[in-house]
Amino acid sequence: MTAILPPWIVLDSLLHNWLLEDIGRGDRTTSALFPANSIEGTAKWIVKEAGVIAGLPIADRTFKLLDSNLSFIPQVPEGKLCQKGEVIAEISGNFDALLTGERVALNLAMRLSGIATLTKKYVDKIADLPVQLVDTRKTTPGLRLLEKYATQVGGACNHRMGLDDAVMVKDNHIAAAGGIAEAIALIRNSIPYPLTIEVETETLAEVETALQHKADIIMLDNMSLDLMRQAVAIIRQKSDRVKIEASGNVTLETIRSVAETGVDYISTSAPITRSTWLDLSMKINSNTRSPAGV
């Protein structure tokens, strides 16, 4: 599966804001050292610990918003597992753009690479089983599009990007509506017909109710493995159409056991909420310094 970047028209707006947040009234240090577009040079990005690389196209775009002529050449493809010391990008252009954009570009790539790295660890645990890992809406405000892109790079599939993607009837919806049957009935009377309905369940009785009212996807939330196996058996016996999703307290230690219950999807926020940044750095090649245009 190829990870798909959000449209640049959307990302550019985000990148502009993040650059403005860092630059403020101007990069005092760099502007004092180098008048705009006066000195050119080269730099490289280096991996300081093993991990899966994600976010190089976004780093490229970040720098190009500061200098459209800057050259950012990835040395590895997105999703590659790199080792400490590998060079992952070669950059050439004006020093003012290189130095001013360095932190924002690196921050994004480090964050996304950390997510992709942990995602791959989860995916590898279930790679030989007929189940798909999916992410959740537990994302950092403002970073959802990129964090979900990173889970794709790591081998997962995106769940809902937002509330407008599909209907998911969760425990609080059920409580507010008075029950699963009541919630589904109200929803079917108002949603566009192409939208699927997913229902969160915690008991076998709730699974039966969701089946009776023709939910498209049934989530088994925080169930024990034994209860999950029973729920899967009930659903498979009564419908070959309904998809089954397991969720809740999924860890690297438990994900394979969850997958072996026979569910179609396993959703977890862990690759995003529990990942750490992958350590990357940029090093200027001091011997390549030259006046711009020379």
Kindly label every feature range from the protein language model.
Residues 222, 248, 270:
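Short secondary-structure boundary segments
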Residues 1-9, 287-294:
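Short, low-complexity, intrinsically disordered N-terminal peptides in bacterial proteins
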Residues 2-213, 217, 226-234, 243-245, ...:
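Acidic/glycine-rich phosphate/pyrophosphate-binding loops and surrounding catalytic core
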Residues 252:
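Cys/His-rich Zn2+-binding cysteine-cluster or related metal-binding knuckle/ribbon modules and their
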